[in-house]
Amino acid sequence: INTANPSPNSVNSSEFCAKYERNIAETYDVLEIIANGPMFDVSDYISGAKKMKIDVYSPAVGIPIQITLEDSTTATPTNYPTGRHSEYIGVTTVANQWETVELVFNGQPDPSLSNVGITSIILLFNPATNTDDTYYFDNLMGPEVNGPCNGFISNPQSDFQDWDCNWNINFGYMSGQLLQSYNPAVGSVNTSKYSAKYT
């Protein structure tokens, strides 16, 4: 969920960040981040020429963080390693303060996948455990995306929020979750790929 930054510092001075409460019942509790378009060639991340990074506020030192680049059109919860292009691992080095964790290439579960056109980033905190820790994260930096917002210039005077390319306002609410979601019924009234979902 979107929440106030628990402790701004020089690493992450943002007013807001993501808050994630790990599900103790899940050994591999995953966060799926669907790119707003297919990813460009990710081979530089495999070779190490480019690095994935994420700002993390974690409860302990030594917690592994994993990113899996995935083709979500073929990957399902039960068919590992199909659809999992490559995995990257980083480890926390401080507790209860922001740090930038760098993730390095750790293998290719499904080497048959192309380096071009990956659709999703799967983010795992402390995988292969059953813990219920709380994490905060922000500023995920990784593969470039061939998305519809490339070259888009926002006009905040007329485009407040369309959940695709315009993000010009913040929302305050008392309960529930407000998320970006796939448009459930694309049509002539609303042709957007994404919309808001409130539960």
Enumerate the language-model features and the residues they cover.
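Beta-rich carbohydrate-recognition modules and glycan-binding surfaces
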Residues: 1-199
